[in-house]
């Protein structure tokens, strides 16, 4: 019986050392985009509904994605969006359009009010481009479709692709998120300008 004690002690020590092993802390991030142009009230005559942003299948998970070579990508399990990225971008898009004052009101897609327009969108790309170690960049590309839903047959009224390639200070997750925020702000600002021009034409 005594011969089993040393083996048991060794196993116990190994088990305890495994329990004490430290793992990297997971970090969670979100977007924080503010429309700097203040509008007194919604000035338009039409309602618009905002569909949830569709996301390229490659970015359905919450992990950050890094491009490390011409055809090489890796995901970062320890740095993530705190919600699915489509939900986060949808929230920023809704807030931005609500503050733009282009339309009479901006509505969620499940609202029962009949809206003239529906805004569909797709997040095509979102990743950190670290393929050049000396020139890290934040990539964010989106596509938008403005659908006229005022008649029995919906028609595409406007569409455009917006691509952003932002130089960032380092390959850290914090710097990457700052770059994505800048990229998303640039896209929403240009989208607002284009939709305002279209609405006033």
Which positions does each model-derived feature cover?
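Sec-dependent bacterial lipoprotein signal peptides
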Residues: 1-16
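Surface-exposed short loop/turn segments
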Residues: 17-41, 100-155, 169
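Soluble periplasmic/extracytoplasmic beta-strand elements of cell-envelope proteins
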Residues: 47-52, 65, 118-122, 139-145, ...
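Short secondary-structure boundary motifs at beta->alpha junctions and helix caps
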Residues: 72-80, 150-186
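Sec-exported extracytoplasmic/periplasmic mature domains
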Residues: 94, 98-102, 128, 192, ...
